[in-house]
Amino acid sequence: TRYWIVRPGDSPAHVVPAVRTLLEVLGTRFQERLAEMGLPPYRLEITSALRTAERQARLRRNNANAAAGVSSHEFGTTVDLSYAAFAPPAEVPGQIIDGVSEDLRPHIRRIADLAFESVSARKSRELGRIFSQVLAEAQDEGIALVIYERQQTVYHLTVGRAM
């Protein structure tokens, strides 16, 4: 989407509608903050969403953060969002592509994506700091419960009752 991507893995990207709404709110706020700082509209990376009980049990063997017993991931109310990696913008900004002939646009898009990924990698701490501020505000508003996971470089995000 405009605000996030789902990193390929063995976790289906299914969530309850309130999580999708929450992701839209967080993505909008994140990109607004980036725009205020003159940065491109980077997107959030979802690393995990819906999990079966079996998948959760397997994960628990290697991940100390994985809940024992029932996990909120089993209900589609939770996603894990990377705080160390951010995806390039969904669209190449107009100022990069305007005036470029149609036959060159695919090449320019590919080069722009590579450049955005390179900048994202170098600026991941700054982007992560901005995103953490957005999450803290969402938690203060009661629309999200956020858990910082050190070993997996993700925020464990559960939709809040206020959503």
Task: Report each predicted region and the residues it spans.
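Active-site acidic/histidine clusters and adjacent loop/turn architecture
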Residues: 1-40
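Catalytic cores and adjacent binding grooves of peptidoglycan-active enzymes
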Residues: 66-163
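Acidic helix-start/capping segments at beta-turn-to-alpha-helix junctions
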Residues: 39-57
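Generic detector of short, locally flexible boundary/turn motifs and exposed helical patches
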Residues: 8-14, 43-49, 110-111, 119-125
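N-terminal start-of-chain detector that recognizes signal peptides
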Residues: 15-20, 50-56, 118-119, 126-132
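Charged/polar, solvent-exposed surface patches and flexible loops
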Residues: 28, 57-61, 129, 133-137
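Charged, often glycine-rich, active-site loop that binds/positions anionic groups
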Residues: 53-69
